[in-house]
A protein has these predicted regions:
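Inter-lobe coupling/hinge segments of SF2-like helicase ATPases
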Residues: 251, 255-261, 265, 269, ...
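A short, contiguous, amphipathic alpha-helix enriched in charged residues
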Residues: 39, 68-69, 583, 606, ...
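Short amphipathic alpha-helix segments
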Residues: 728-760
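Surface-exposed amphipathic alpha-helical segments in non-transmembrane regions
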Residues: 693-694, 700-701, 738-739, 744, ...
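Accessory, non-ATPase domains that flank or precede helicase/AAA+ motor cores in DNA-metabolism machines
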Residues: 1-419, 426, 432-452, 487, ...
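Short helix-capping segments at alpha-helix termini
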Residues: 332, 579-581, 741-752, 800-802
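Short, flexible, solvent-exposed loop/turn segments with mixed acidic/basic and small polar residues
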Residues: 45, 200, 704-709, 765-771
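Short proline/glycine- and acidic-rich turn/helix-capping motifs at secondary-structure junctions
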Residues: 750-754, 758-771, 808-817
């Protein structure tokens, strides 16, 4: 419910004739302003580039005890009310950070404190670093540190009045009933059956009133009667939602092994060395799939907790399965808080409060878990550090690895990066030895624990299959592999990185591919709902493809609008036709995992099955550990190889290597069958031969020649508008300003032995139109170590703003589409 404010007075009433008066009432004197006892830097919760810097406000005497760094406050700004966040407090105006010799007489006072402190002074400093590093507003960066649901906001209503909106998500208090010491000796009358039932139930411990009422069809009157007698006591306790996630998965145990492998021991020793040195150093754990990286994390966390500090573990959202969470909770119990998108808003708030209160000392979560209010942070772990999902897609477009490295430096704790396919950037920094003031060390873990070995990889050349007359989506080797799985009652995993039934429809007469009316992207066909769906904006259209009699091409009217390519739904249908009925076929993609706990339930179904095939998109490639899986099949490995993105090969290699690692993790040997039309591609060869260098040597040569990361920093400036000309003109203006700036500074770069930053473009984006907005971008290549953000920010300020045109900056960009 919004709380109405009277900040600027009520509207003047219409004049009415004054009633006769005997004498004029004396005018009420204006109250004297409160004395200002301190000053605060306040960042307004208005995310515009022009208002990014803090503003100085006075702290009146009445608010002096409440005002803290991290508090949300209500202030006047111009002719409006605004919420803001205190990021600094000083007794004198001259001592305030960012003060530009302001006149104390002109400083306005803070009107009210809207919330307690929600972040620390160190968090405010990290947010300021992020704001500068990623050319984002400071308020956007501070919001990352706020609790789920946010903080109070000031909004303008339809009537023009300003009001405070409080977060809708609130804590829940449960009422618990328990016996008093006297209650254990109390004997109820023989006729008091319900009292006896209640006392017998409470002998085992406290019970919620809600559960008692359900169990005994309302116990309220009995509880009140015994409470008056002093037999029971009722108290309110905070409910911690999000802690009850249970799983039947057999591999969710975090029980420590009897012994560690040599690789695990080396990794743990290096992490311990970095912890004791306390310089914020980085350890890259480069371990093959199934090498036991999670056990290294668990053992390192045990040592950190024993030292009285806390730990943060980041896992890609796609890998944050019940298996992963179960391992941490089985080892550390209720001290683990979990954050992921499948939690409700209330569950996220309770997990955040568990961390804030100190009840949780270990956080496991996706990218945003990095900003949880852990006290005395002693270790940061980023699992699957190569994952592109660690790069935020909206402003502030930070990379979790870079922010974590900055946090590790400030908190003087180690940062551990783990992956079977480390990113080119992390490997390059380990080769250099130092980066950003920290030491970067790589530790290899080449072996799997026990007797498990890496799977055998076979390549199914689809060119030969086609030449021999096969038109099936499954090659002969893959069919034979699935038959062996069924015969031995084992399990298989099939990867196909396209959801839906068919990637697109195409007219066989004119070649038209239906595209979204609002975006320049082809529509995906979904057989279950008979719809074409846009996976960019979510729009959908009902359609009946050929051979339905109602099938019609939107361009030429032909009825030969046919399904082209493969989707997971189509492969699922083919598997049902090919395999016996007693083989469970389980599909996991964005469509089948929409519901709450759907992801966990599908994995539990796969785990419990006697013989099963798990078919899915990239979400099945990581974070899964099923010893019964002996076969992994890749239906089409070529889809991601030739995308117009210099990281396409790296992403394809990561995906194939990761999914291949799902096979042979138990006592039984594993087999991987990769179907491809490009068997000689370095990505395919590297996976097949278990030799990363086949791909990385080729890939790094290509990047070095073309000047791409890790040899330069790559920034993407994106402009969009419903008016294509306005967007094109605006990005052209930005490009000219950048080129002019660096042309003038070229002698300075050359004297320093550094390359001059380059501007490529502007040009239309690969997806030229999305949600009815035309998109243009330019790329900036700058030397590694050069702080290009300051130059970009200065040019954006000089370019000004254009009504209806939006701009975003992606420093160290991952997505160039």
């Amino acid at each position: 419910m919004a709380q109405q404010l009277s900040l600027f007075g009520s509207p003047e009433p219409e004049e009415t004739p004054a009633a006769p008066a005997l004498a004029a009432a004396p005018a009420k004197p204006e109250p004297a302003p409160e004395p200002i006892v301190a000053y605060a830097s306040v960042v307004l919760d208005i995310p515009t580039r022009a208002l990014s810097e803090p503003f100085a406000y006075g702290i009146p005497e009445s608010l002096a005890n409440e005002a803290q760094v991290g508090s949300t406050v209500l202030v006047h700004f111009g002719n409006r009310a605004a919420a803001g966040y205190i990021v600094d407090i000083a007794p004198e105006l001259d001592d305030l950070q960012g003060n530009n010799a302001l006149d104390p007489a002109r400083i306005k006072a803070i009107e009210a404190i809207l919330s307690k402190s929600l972040f620390t002074a160190e968090a405010a400093r990290i947010a300021r670093w992020m704001s500068r590093e990623y050319v984002a507003t400071l308020s956007e960066c501070l919001r990352l540190f706020l609790p789920p649901g946010g903080s109070p906001r000031v909004v303008k209503g339809d009537d023009g009045a300003w009001s405070v909106e409080r977060p809708a998500v609130k804590p829940i208090q449960n009422r618990w009933v328990m016996l008093t010491p006297e209650g254990f000796d109390y004997t109820p009358p023989k006729t008091a059956v319900r009292q006896r039932q209640l006392i017998e139930t409470l002998q085992c411990g406290p019970v919620m009133t809600r559960d008692l009422n359900l169990l005994y069809n309302s116990m309220s009157a009995t509880i009140k009667a015994l409470e008056k007698r002093g037999v029971v006591v009722v108290e309110e306790r905070r409910a911690w939602r999000g802690c009850s996630e249970q799983t039947t998965l057999s591999s969710a145990s975090g029980k420590a092994p009897v012994s560690l492998t040599n690789g695990q021991q080396r990794a743990l020793a290096q992490i311990e060395r970095a912890r004791l040195d306390a310089h914020g150093d980085v350890v890259l754990v480069d371990g093959v799939t199934g090498s036991g990286k999670t056990e290294v994390y668990l053992s390192a966390i045990e040592r950190v907790l024993a030292a009285g500090r806390s730990a943060c573990v980041l896992v890609p959202e796609i890998s944050l399965t019940a298996q992963t969470v179960g391992r941490f909770r089985s080892r550390f119990g209720e001290t683990v808080a979990v954050f992921h998108s499948r939690l409700s808003a209330g569950e996220r708030l309770d997990q955040w409060d568990m961390v804030s209160s100190g009840a949780a000392r270990v956080v496991v979560g996706a990218r945003s878990a990095l900003f949880c209010p852990l006290s005395d942070l002693g270790l940061i772990i980023i699992d699957e550090e190569h994952e592109a999902s660690y790069k935020q897609g909206s402003s502030p477009r930070y990379h979790a690895r870079e922010v974590a490295a900055e946090m590790a430096r400030r908190y003087r704790c180690p940062l551990v990066l783990g992956s079977a396919t480390p990113s080119a950037e992390s490997l390059d920094r380990c080769r250099r030895g130092t980066y950003g003031g920290a030491t970067w060390t790589r530790v290899e873990m080449p072996e799997r624990p026990g007797h498990a070995v890496l799977p055998t990889v076979r390549i199914a050349d689809l060119r030969r299959e086609f030449a021999h007359g096969s038109r099936s989506m499954f090659s002969k080797p893959l069919v034979e592999g699935l038959e062996r799985v069924v015969e031995r009652r084992e399990k298989a995993v099939l990867l196909h990185n396209r959801r839906g039934f068919a990637p697109f429809l195409m007219c066989r007469e004119c070649g038209c591919v239906p595209t979204c009316n609002h975006c320049s992207t082809a529509l995906t066909y979904h057989e279950r709902t008979h719809t074409l769906q846009c996976h960019t904006c979510g729009s959908s259209w009902r359609v009946e493809p050929y051979p339905a009699p109602t099938s019609r091409c939107p361009k030429c009217g032909s009825r030969y609008l046919a399904k082209m390519g493969l989707g997971t739904q189509q492969i699922e249908d083919a598997l049902h036709q090919m395999l016996p009925d007693d083989v469970a076929i389980i599909r996991m993609d964005a469509d089948s995992t929409r519901g709450k706990d759907a992801h966990k339930k599908l994995l539990e179904q796969f785990d419990a099955a006697d013989c099963a095939v798990l078919l899915g998109t990239q979400m099945i490639a990581k974070g899964l550990d099923f010893p019964e899986v002996t076969l992994v099949g890749v239906v089409n490995a070529d889809f991601a190889l030739k995308l117009p993105d210099f990281r396409a090969g790296e992403r394809a290699y990561d995906l194939l290597e990761q999914v291949a690692g799902r096979a042979g993790r138990g006592d039984r040997p594993g087999e991987v069958i990769i179907q491809t039309y490009l068997p000689d591609d370095p990505v395919i060869r590297a996976v097949a031969e278990h030799d990363r260098s086949i791909f990385t040597d080729y890939d790094l040569d290509q990047r070095r020649d073309a000047l791409y990361s890790p040899f330069v920093r790559l920034s993407n400036i994106l402009v969009w508008s419903t008016n294509a000309d306005d967007a094109r003109d605006y990005i052209g203006r930005i490009a000219k300003l950048l080129k002019r700036r660096w042309h003038a500074a070229a002698p300075d770069f050359l004297r320093a032995g550094s390359a001059v930053p380059q501007v490529l473009g502007p040009a239309s984006c690969v997806i030229e139109r999305a949600k009815d907005r035309y998109r243009f971008h330019l790329l900036v290549k700058s030397p590694v170590g050069y702080h290009v953000s300051d130059d970009i920010d200065a040019c954006l300020k000089e370019a000004g703003s254009v009504r209806g045109v939006s701009v975003s900056v992606d420093v160290d960009a991952y997505d160039l589409m």
